[in-house]
Amino acid sequence: DQDKVFKFFKKIKPELVNIAAARVGGIQANSNFKQKFIYENLQIQNNLIHGSFLAKVKNLIFLGSSCIYPKLCKQPMKESYLLSGKLEETNDAYAIAKIAGIMMCYNYSLNYKLNYQSLMPPNLFGPGDNYNLKNSHFFPALLKKIYLAKVKRKKTLDVWGTGKPKRELMF
């Protein structure tokens, strides 16, 4: 609700807004609920970025995602590779929303002389993470699969993908 966001920002007068909020999930969730991922992420971003502008917030940090880069992106990834190829189909709706947030920050900064920056964090994991095998991110799901294989004394492990993508991880 953009009006509530604006009223909240007007009341507390933040010097900096840090946007880490997003609907997130793994391959299965991103594939099955694309409409939710694009709609909810655009709503979150639009409300927070524009609400910050209306409340005269000068500094904003927007967290992007490595999924904004092309599916066949050269490794290691560089900022210049953004929009240089086709996105991964399984999470293109989420990626498009994140790209829109990046462009909003860029253009608010350009047009209004604000310090609205976009940062691309690595894949984060840790306490309180989602370890559900059906809708978690890659690394928490992998950790859970390894744990379950160990507990059940399995000799093999089912891991999706080719194994070629490189990932940065941070605990």
Show which residues each predicted segment covers.
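Arginine residue identity/basic-tract feature
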Residues: K10-K11, R23, R153-K155, R167
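Short leucine-rich amphipathic alpha-helices used at interfaces
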Residues: S31, V151-K152
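Substrate-positioning beta->alpha
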Residues: A93-I96, M104, Q117-S118, N130-K145, ...
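Short helix-terminating capping/connector loops at secondary-structure junctions
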Residues: K113-L114, K152-K154
